[in-house]
């Protein structure tokens, strides 16, 4: 087995890993990025045409970070000369008397993001394709939209190579068998290489706990199911007419649904955000249950009836990696300044990934944000997080 040494190793070439590689390469840092599957694969959490981006968060800490997250994507677009953000507008709605809408509106106000708060009846007049219960609480954010997910990951990998030249190396289809932390430097072991590195960033998603089994917080990988509907009349669901949406239930109806317009030839994406039973990420299961499809159709019948009977012409699965509190994990390993872990994202991290790549580069190089104070990252993202 060959032994090599390098300065920066990143494990995992999804949203977080590609962003970290891009940001490090822009700074002139050598980067070795290792991915167990082919680049652009659909086995993890970063594939698919699009993801929602929005300032609309009920948690004020995430809402405060979203302007910086939007700015990070703008910087990527300027560097690449291509767009990844698609402005569609976004609507968040919830039952009357539930504090979700009030929290979202208050947080948008606090960060200075334009928005309108209204009743379900008001919203149905604005966009008649919806049939939201009249008393529901609705918040509309004009600047919410979508991120071209697969394109964004590919662009960051391309730019990492452009900025880094020969100093950027990408190793696809290369599983990491173990990480040795017994010596003075982290050592990454593949089937053919032993790699000693000055700094190791682990952005391996659902495989993080396999590579770092002694993490002090339990992480759970769950399989998510996504549906794409093909309505007979697509016009009301096109970008410019149909916004991204978030529905948050309350009481006995604690369901959390989301959706977005068709993009790059896909149908209308609708799914339930749900932390289900734990799954083994190495066991590939692409089935989507009929019962799940009926749950989603039931939601549509009550809120977007014109879509409820549309055929499903595509299904996808992906993985969430979830912490018990559903926050992110971005931190140094305890007692190590040379090993950084950046996962899970608990099902809502893609919109932050370009920003987190910048933070990871700061942490790895001792840059201006390496203490993370300047970006006000959450104490809840640390391994030793508040209970």
PLM features per residue range, with description:
Residues 2-16, 32:
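Beta1/beta-strand and adjacent pyrophosphate-binding region of the FAD-binding site
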């Amino acid at each position: 087995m060959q032994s090599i040494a390098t300065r920066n190793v990143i494990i995992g070439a999804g949203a977080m890993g590609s962003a970290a590689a891009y940001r490090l390469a822009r700074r002139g840092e050598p980067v070795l990025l290792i991915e167990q599957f082919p680049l652009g694969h659909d086995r993890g959490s970063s594939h698919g045409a699009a993801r929602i981006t929005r300032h609309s968060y009920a948690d004020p800490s995430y809402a405060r970070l979203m302007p910086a997250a939007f700015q990070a994507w703008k910087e990527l677009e300027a560097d690449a000369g291509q767009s990844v953000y698609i402005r569609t507008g976004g609507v968040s709605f919830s039952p009357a008397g539930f504090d979700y809408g009030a929290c979202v509106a208050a947080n948008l106000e606090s960060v200075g993001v334009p928005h309108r708060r209204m009743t379900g009846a008001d919203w149905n007049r604005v966009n008649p394709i919806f049939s939201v219960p009249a008393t529901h609480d609705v918040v509309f954010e004009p600047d919410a939209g979508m991120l071209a997910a697969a394109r964004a990951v590919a662009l960051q990998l391309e730019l990492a190579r452009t900025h880094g030249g020969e100093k950027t190396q990408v190793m696809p289809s290369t599983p990491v068998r173990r990480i040795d932390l017994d010596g003075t430097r982290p050592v990454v072991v593949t089937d053919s290489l032993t790699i000693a590195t000055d700094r190791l960033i682990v952005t391996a998603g659902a495989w993080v706990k396999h590579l770092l089994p002694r993490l002090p917080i339990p992480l759970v990988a769950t399989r998510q199911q996504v549906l794409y509907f093909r309505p007979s009349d697509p016009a009301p669901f096109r970008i410019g007419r149909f916004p991204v949406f978030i529905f948050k239930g309350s009481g006995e109806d604690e369901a959390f649904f989301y959706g977005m317009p068709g993009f790059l030839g896909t149908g209308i994406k609708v799914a339930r955000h749900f932390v289900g039973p734990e799954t083994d990420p190495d066991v590939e299961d692409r089935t989507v249950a009929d019962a799940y499809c009926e749950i989603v159709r039931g939601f549509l019948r009550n809120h977007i009836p014109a879509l409820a009977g549309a055929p499903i012409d595509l299904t996808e699965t992906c993985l969430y990696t979830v912490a018990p509190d559903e926050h992110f994990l971005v931190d140094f390993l305890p007692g190590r300044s040379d090993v950084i872990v950046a996962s899970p994202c608990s099902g809502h991290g893609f919109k932050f990934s370009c920003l987190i790549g910048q933070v990871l580069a700061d942490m790895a190089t001792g840059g201006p944000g390496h203490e993370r104070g300047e970006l006000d990252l959450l104490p809840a993202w640390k391994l030793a997080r508040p209970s």
